[in-house]
Swiss-Prot record:
E.C. number: 4.2.1.54
Catalytic activity from the UniProt record: (R)-lactoyl-CoA = acryloyl-CoA + H2O; (2R)-hydroxybutanoyl-CoA = (2E)-butenoyl-CoA + H2O
GO molecular function, one term: 4 iron, 4 sulfur cluster binding
Cofactor list: [4Fe-4S] cluster; FMN; riboflavin; Mg(2+)
Broad class of enzyme this protein falls into: lyase
Superkingdom field: Bacteria
Name listed for the protein in its UniProt record: Lactoyl-CoA dehydratase subunit alpha
Protein keywords: 4Fe-4S, Flavoprotein, FMN, Iron, Iron-sulfur, Lyase, Metal-binding
Function as written in the Swiss-Prot or TrEMBL entry: Involved in the acrylate pathway for the conversion of D-lactic acid to propionic acid. Catalyzes the reversible dehydration of Lactoyl-CoA and 2-hydroxybutyroyl-CoA to acryloyl-CoA and crotonyl-CoA, respectively.
Regulation: Activated by the LcdC protein.
Homology family: Belongs to the FldB/FldC dehydratase alpha/beta subunit family.
InterPro entries in the cross-refs: FldB/FldC_alpha/beta (IPR010327)
Biological source species: Anaerotignum propionicum (Clostridium propionicum)
Pfam families per record: HGD-D (PF06050)
Length: 422
């Protein structure tokens, strides 16, 4: 009997999150390779080669959500990493320094012993991709330099125009082949193209069920609380090329569909307004942001951030052009016009009444674009919006009082618009 038989989706999420970390620890103990990977770098290549995967962004988000970010940020501060650098990167570099010290001295530093961070091993290689930001290049370059390990970089050009030209897909496919060649050298064996096809098929099954979950937000009232996407996205990031994600997402999507048929909704009849959240979650204050909106009877039914992992492609395409397109069409890797169109589509599908824009100190790419994006979208659909200050992992930047004041104003504007439309 399977250990997961009879588990609900929430239980599966916790089980497989822990198992992914355990897999990496066991692989390290057996002398097998462990890779630290950027969140939207293709995992398909490493999984095909049997390399255990750890995702520093997800790991840092978990540390932030468990209120442990400050200890790691202080370690990074002492190493000279400026507060203006990405806090995911600073948390991860702090954690890496602690692991490195433990490996050298044989003694875990106190800050690591007391940390709520998930226990993951040091990497034997790192792989990064600049399809979400260029900060990842220097971050992973530093990891590789500090640990004296290989760094594989997959270069994905920014899309200044849409649609994506064929020459861009061809270039990215060449980047994929180059990464595969590097892995063959590192692993000392040839790439298994038959297994690669199986891994791509698995990835597409995971993405399919992930999209089933996101689709549930279109119903009114919604059976899906949009904040749940932030929780479940750990597996679409870290395990999309494993059946861990498929099993969990299928269970959650099935549960949501059953609830919809039974008339069971996320807010149990208390849903009054619907909003879009644009940007990364404020992980150290995730509970506050959710509860504040729920207390105002406002439900999140739109967010583009988890949709970054809507990485559907043709697994039968041996040229890898389809896969290349999937990894480059991510909305924050495209021009402002396309970003606006993506957000407008999400807002329409989710039947939202307004938007919360997270001006994230860490994520300059998303935050700087959001100022202009917000105005363009308001001109197009007339829906109100507010901006809130915060950070994805550094708890010091977010002000609960500011958040509460601004979202209350947003809800008042949304309710006024609804009353005027009646």
């Amino acid at each position: 009997m399977s250990l997961t038989q009879g588990m609900k989706a929430k239980q599966l999420l916790a089980y497989f999150q822990g198992k992914a970390d355990q897999d990496a620890r066991e692989a390290k103990a057996r002398g097998e390779l462990v890779c630290w990977s950027a969140s939207v770098a293709p995992p398909e290549f490493c999984v095909t080669m049997g390399i255990a995967m750890i995702y520093p962004e997800t790991h840092a988000a978990g540390i932030g959500a468990r209120k442990g970010a400050m200890d790691m940020l202080e370690v990074a501060d002492r190493k000279g990493y400026n507060v203006d650098c990405c806090s995911y990167g600073r948390v991860n570099m702090g954690y890496m320094e602690c692991l490195k010290e433990a490996a050298i001295t044989g003694v875990k530093p106190e800050v690591l012993v007391n940390s709520p961070a998930a226990d993951v091993p040091l990497p034997d290689l790192v792989i990064t991709c600049n399809n979400i930001c260029n900060t990842l290049l220097k971050w992973y370059e530093n990891l590789a330099a500090e640990l004296d390990i290989p760094c594989i970089v997959i270069d994905v050009p920014f899309n200044h125009t849409m649609p994506i030209p064929e020459y861009a897909k061809a270039y990215i496919a060449d980047q994929f082949r180059n990464a595969i060649s590097q892995l063959e050298v590192i692993c000392g064996r040839p790439f298994d193209w038959k297994k690669f096809k199986e891994v791509k098929d698995q990835t597409q099954r995971s993405v399919y069920h992930w999209n089933r979950i996101a689709e549930m937000a279109k119903y009114k009232p919604s059976p899906l609380n949009g904040f749940d996407l932030f929780n479940y996205m750990a597996l679409i990031v870290a395990c999309r090329s494993l059946d861990y994600a498929e099993i969990t997402f299928k269970a959650f999507a099935d549960e949501l569909e059953e609830n919809l048929k039974a008339g069971i909704y996320a807010f149990k009849g208390a849903e009054k307004t619907r909003f879009q959240w644009e940007g990364i979650a404020v992980w150290p204050h995730l509970g506050h942001t959710f509860k504040s909106m729920k207390n105002l009877n406002s439900i999140m039914t739109g967010t583009a951030y988890p949709a970054l992992w809507d990485l559907h492609y043709d697994a039968n395409d041996e040229s890898m052009h389809s896969m290349a397109e999937a990894y480059t069409r991510i909305y924050i890797n495209t021009c402002l016009q396309n970003k606006v169109e993506v957000l407008l589509g999400i807002m329409e599908k989710g039947q939202v009444d307004g938007t919360v824009y997270h001006l994230n100190r860490s994520c300059k790419l998303m935050s700087f674009l959001n100022v202009e994006t917000a105005e363009i979208i308001k001109e197009k659909n007339g829906l109100p919006y507010v901006s809130i200050d915060g950070d994805q992992t550094d708890p010091r930047v977010f002000s609960p009082a500011q958040f509460d004041t601004r979202v209350q104003a947003l809800v008042e504007m949304m309710e006024a618009n609804m009353a005027a439309a009646e």
